[in-house]
């Protein structure tokens, strides 16, 4: 049976009821895990049994071992994010998604050789640390049952004390040739039938949970895989169904896609699922081009020394992101501004409400990045073209609107 990835069938409610109805007090972690387990979908006719994860790496015994493993994986030097020259629109969209993952990811379209992949991969150094359960392939959060893997949730229900380690948010690359089983994970049908055990080998979606999933040349990816990725990103859950056996696990990640419009566009209904859209152009200023070439030459000669020269700027930016993530919940946006955002969307004939929601979230994230607790008109003006330009109705033969129409409508409504 083919994989079914549908928010209606694969995902539990987005906001868990983690409070006792009788006392209005927070539930214990064990009770919360039980509440989440009760909401995970099960279908009549699907087999039930124990859940095991196979073919995963052995857990690190200590935090030092985990750090050593992470250092080994990152031996290839990464170009510093702070050293990227220009491309401010793309960099801002990436930072806002790191601050608020619920924005829904970003689609980056631009000419070849403009630094799309380099910029996305340079984001790794700025990602904050998170607490994860040692040895868990789903990067389970030990404090939040909503993002726990099934095996960890069972351990919590049994009262086991979970070993925890601090690790960097991961970035997972999805290759163009990946199969659906590699992306979603596979079930060992033979073991399930003979031993009554749901033997599940996690895929890339499991590895990307609580992290970033990057798809280069996403416009060349098979449409059914794009559907799978977007549905999982929207629902936060991945469900694998094979031969009457169903397994669900959390898959909350920031989806970042990039591509060259000359090689083809994504379908409009798929574009709409990306929270933001960034356009990247070739730098035309001769001085900037020379600076980019020189900086790249410095990096190629001595990557370590080049990275150290930007260490202070990188640390400052990382602290700014961490502070913005912490203060995001305190940021407010006036009702009048929310009404005007919706008016812009309505007058541009934007289908659905995703444009309204994403614009509100992106404006709040930008205010938090700037260290403020109130959204201004300037914040909205900065993000609204990236939130709406790819949602406008257009002639199939035209390229994506450059954002000028959005900007014109914005100033018409806000002035």
Swiss-Prot record:
Transit peptide: 1-67
Leading EC class: ligase
Catalytic reaction equation(s): protoporphyrin IX + Mg(2+) + ATP + H2O = Mg-protoporphyrin IX + ADP + phosphate + 3 H(+)
GO cellular component: chloroplast stroma
Disulfide linkage: 93-184, 345-387
GO process terms (BP): chlorophyll biosynthetic process; photosynthesis
Known pathway: Porphyrin-containing compound metabolism; chlorophyll biosynthesis
One Pfam family cited in the UniProt record for this chain: AAA_lid_2
Entry keyword annotation includes ATP-binding: yes
Activation/inhibition comment: Redox regulation; active in reducing conditions, inactive in oxidizing conditions. Thioredoxins f and m mediate the reversible reductive activation of oxidized CHLI.
Gene Ontology MF annotations: ATP binding; ATP hydrolysis activity; magnesium chelatase activity
Keywords: ATP-binding, Chlorophyll biosynthesis, Chloroplast, Disulfide bond, Ligase, Nucleotide-binding, Photosynthesis, Plastid, Transit peptide
Annotated EC: 6.6.1.1
Summary of subunit composition and partner proteins: The magnesium chelatase complex is a heterotrimer consisting of subunits CHLI, CHLD and CHLH.
Task of the protein: Involved in chlorophyll biosynthesis. Catalyzes the insertion of magnesium ion into protoporphyrin IX to yield Mg-protoporphyrin IX. The reaction takes place in two steps, with an ATP-dependent activation followed by an ATP-dependent chelation step.
Membership in a protein family: Belongs to the Mg-chelatase subunits D/I family.
Protein name: Magnesium-chelatase subunit ChlI, chloroplastic
Organism the protein comes from: Oryza sativa subsp. japonica
Name of the gene this protein is made from: CHLI
């Amino acid at each position: 049976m083919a994989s079914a990835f549908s928010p209606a069938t694969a995902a539990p409610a987005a906001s868990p009821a983690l409070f006792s109805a009788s006392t209005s007090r927070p539930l214990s972690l064990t009770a919360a895990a039980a509440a989440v387990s009760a909401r995970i979908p099960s279908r009549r006719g699907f087999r039930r049994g124990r859940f095991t994860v196979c073919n995963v790496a052995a857990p690190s015994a200590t935090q030092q071992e985990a750090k050593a493993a992470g250092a080994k994986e990152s031996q290839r030097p990464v170009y510093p994010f702070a050293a990227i020259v220009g491309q401010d629109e793309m960099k801002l969209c990436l930072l806002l998604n790191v601050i608020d993952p619920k924005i829904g990811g970003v689609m980056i379209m631009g000419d070849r050789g403009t630094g799309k992949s380099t910029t996305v991969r340079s984001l790794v150094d700025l990602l904050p640390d998170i607490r994860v359960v040692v040895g868990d392939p789903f990067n389970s959060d030990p404090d939040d049952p909503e993002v726990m893997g099934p095996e960890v949730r069972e351990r919590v229900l049994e009262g086991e004390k979970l070993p925890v380690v601090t690790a960097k948010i991961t970035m997972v690359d999805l290759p163009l040739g990946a199969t659906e089983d590699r992306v979603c994970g596979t079930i060992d049908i033979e073991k399930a039938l003979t031993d009554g055990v749901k033997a599940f080998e996690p895929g890339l979606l499991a590895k990307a949970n609580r992290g970033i999933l990057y798809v280069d040349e996403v416009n060349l990816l098979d449409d059914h895989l794009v559907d799978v990725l977007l549905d999982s990103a929207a629902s936060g859950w991945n469900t694998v169904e094979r031969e009457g056996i169903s397994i669900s696990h959390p898959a909350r990640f920031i989806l970042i896609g990039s591509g060259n419009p000359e090689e083809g566009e994504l379908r409009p209904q798929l574009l709409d699922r990306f929270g933001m859209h960034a356009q990247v152009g070739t730098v035309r200023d001769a001085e900037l081009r020379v600076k980019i070439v020189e900086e790249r030459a410095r990096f190629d000669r001595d990557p370590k020394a080049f990275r150290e020269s930007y260490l202070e700027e990188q640390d400052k930016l990382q602290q700014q992101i961490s502070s913005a993530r912490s203060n995001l919940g305190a940021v407010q946006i006036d009702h009048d501004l929310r009404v005007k955002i919706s008016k812009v969307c309505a007058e541009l004939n934007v289908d659905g409400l995703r444009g309204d929601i994403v614009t509100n979230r992106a404006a709040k994230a930008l205010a938090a990045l700037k260290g403020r607790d109130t959204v201004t008109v300037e914040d909205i003006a900065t993000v609204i073209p990236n939130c709406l330009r790819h949602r406008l109705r257009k002639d199939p033969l035209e390229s994506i609107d450059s954002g000028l129409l959005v900007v014109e409508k914005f100033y018409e409504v806000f002035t």
